[in-house]
């Protein structure tokens, strides 16, 4: 389940944050955002976000952990690579994560994926930012 929480006292940036909750192992609790990215022009994506976790455990399989995943696609919309930040597990307070993700030369589009991704517990995200660096 996805919730938008409005709480300026606990949101690390602004007044709202997104929260995912799931009690059913293996359930795909997530949000996606697609965007154009040309690997001939952009070599690196800078990603930053705030994340908080409560009682996070893997899902039906040990690779079902919450993480932030960017999947890159070529001009035929075939997946060519994944870049990941995480996984996240257990309990932890708000913290900022930053990463530099390599953009494949063949990339023309990408999808950013966040959520529990099959895991159980609760994970929250705030102030997700992406910016590109020229090749």
Model-derived segments and spans:
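Extracellular and organelle-lumenal recognition/adhesion modules and their flexible linkers in secreted
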Residues: 1-135
């Amino acid at each position: 389940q996805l919730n938008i929480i409005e709480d300026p006292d606990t949101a690390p940036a602004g007044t709202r944050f997104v929260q995912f909750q799931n009690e059913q192992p293996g359930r795909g609790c997530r949000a996606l955002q697609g965007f154009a990215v040309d690997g001939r022009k952009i070599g690196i994506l800078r990603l930053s976000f705030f994340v908080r976790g409560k009682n996070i455990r893997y899902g039906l399989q040990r690779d079902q952990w919450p993480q932030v995943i960017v999947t890159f696609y070529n001009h035929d919309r075939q997946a060519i690579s994944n870049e990941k930040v995480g996984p996240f597990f257990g309990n932890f307070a708000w913290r900022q994560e930053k990463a530099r993700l390599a953009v494949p030369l063949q990339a023309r589009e990408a999808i950013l994926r966040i959520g529990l991704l099959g895991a159980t517990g609760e994970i929250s995200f705030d102030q997700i930012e992406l910016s590109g660096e020229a090749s």
